[in-house]
Amino acid sequence: MTQRTLGGTNRKQKRTSGFRARMRKSNGRKVIQARRKKGRHRLSV
């Protein structure tokens, strides 16, 4: 029996929480704006 690992897939991660995915929605743009304001080095995944 194979063991199920909890390693995520990069494509799914990028599609849901990548920069371009964030810019598509108005709330996503708010997230980017808030992270810029806070001075985050990484704005998105």
Curated annotation (Swiss-Prot):
The keyword Ubl conjugation does not apply. GO terms for molecular function: structural constituent of ribosome. GO terms for cellular component: ribonucleoprotein complex; ribosome. Keywords: Ribonucleoprotein, Ribosomal protein. Residues 1-10 have a biased composition (Polar residues). Pfam families: Ribosomal_L34. Transmembrane segments: none annotated. HAMAP family: Ribosomal_bL34. This is Large ribosomal subunit protein bL34. It comes from Crocosphaera subtropica (strain ATCC 51142 / BH68) (Cyanothece sp. (strain ATCC 51142)). The lineage of its organism: Bacteria, Bacillati, Cyanobacteriota, Cyanophyceae, Oscillatoriophycideae.
